[in-house]
């Protein structure tokens, strides 16, 4: 487990517990999404690189609050200020990831990524979604990605689990077994 994962955990839990208790999970999810977009901007990356290990994270907080503007409510701003005061703002992306996971668990939903070499038809998508719903006991959202390098088959990523049924992987295994 990385240091950022450990640092982010209590902040993600506090954010989730608060948002759940005041029934605004979707609002907080949206605000986390906005901050994530800000964090991924080149200007933000420059600010992140300039922060000292023991220095203030105020420049990063200012940038996030300015860019987030009216999209961030006062409670979320206060949450960010607490993270900054504790010099934990660098973990905000990981807090976002953990918050999203907690929200999905709470709502019994799961997003599953499906990589395919060619598009699946409606019936295949429905059968796959049904099988995953039965396996995980959650409402499933499928995100499909076309990846011609797979040659054929499918690679399914559900949480931390990867099911690789691609032709490419099977050919690689065969080559390994034949010592080619």
Curated annotation (Swiss-Prot):
Principal subcellular localisation of the protein: membrane
GO molecular function annotation: proton-transporting ATP synthase activity, rotational mechanism
Coiled-coil residues: none
Keyword annotations from UniProtKB, A to Z: ATP synthesis, Cell inner membrane, Cell membrane, CF(1), Hydrogen ion transport, Ion transport, Membrane, Transport
Keyword Transport appears in the UniProt entry: yes
One GO cellular component term: proton-transporting ATP synthase complex
Membrane topology: Peripheral membrane protein
Keyword Glycosyltransferase tagged: no
Subcellular location: Cell inner membrane
InterPro entries the UniProt entry points to: ATP_synth_OSCP/delta_N_sf (IPR026015), ATPase_OSCP/dsu (IPR000711)
SUPFAM superfamilies xref list: N-terminal domain of the delta subunit of the F1F0-ATP synthase
Family, per entry: Belongs to the ATPase delta chain family.
Function comment: F(1)F(0) ATP synthase produces ATP from ADP in the presence of a proton or sodium gradient. F-type ATPases consist of two structural domains, F(1) containing the extramembraneous catalytic core and F(0) containing the membrane proton channel, linked together by a central stalk and a peripheral stalk. During catalysis, ATP synthesis in the catalytic domain of F(1) is coupled via a rotary mechanism of the central stalk subunits to proton translocation. This protein is part of the stalk that links CF(0) to CF(1). It either transmits conformational changes from CF(0) to CF(1) or is implicated in proton conduction.
Name the UniProt record assigns to this protein: ATP synthase subunit delta 2
Taxon lineage: Bacteria, Pseudomonadati, Pseudomonadota, Gammaproteobacteria, Vibrionales
């Amino acid at each position: 487990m990385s240091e950022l994962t450990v640092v982010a955990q209590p902040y993600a839990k506090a954010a989730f517990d608060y948002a759940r208790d005041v029934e605004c999970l979707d609002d907080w999810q949206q605000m986390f999404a906005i901050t994530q977009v800000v964090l991924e901007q080149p200007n933000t990356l420059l600010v992140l690189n300039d922060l000292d290990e023991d220095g203030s994270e105020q420049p990063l907080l200012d940038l996030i609050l300015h860019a987030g503007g009216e999209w961030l409510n006062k409670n979320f701003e206060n949450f960010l200020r607490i993270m900054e005061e504790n010099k934990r703002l660098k973990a905000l992306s990981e807090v976002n990831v953990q918050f999203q996971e907690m929200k999905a668990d709470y709502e019994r939903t799961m997003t599953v990524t499906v990589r395919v070499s060619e598009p699946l038809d409606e019936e295949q998508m429905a059968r796959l979604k049904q099988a995953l719903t039965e396996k995980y006991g959650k409402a499933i959202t499928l995100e499909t990605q076309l990846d011609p390098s797979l040659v054929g088959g499918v690679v399914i990523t559900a949480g931390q689990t990867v099911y690789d049924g691609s032709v490419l992987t099977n050919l690689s295994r065969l080559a390994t077994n034949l010592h080619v």
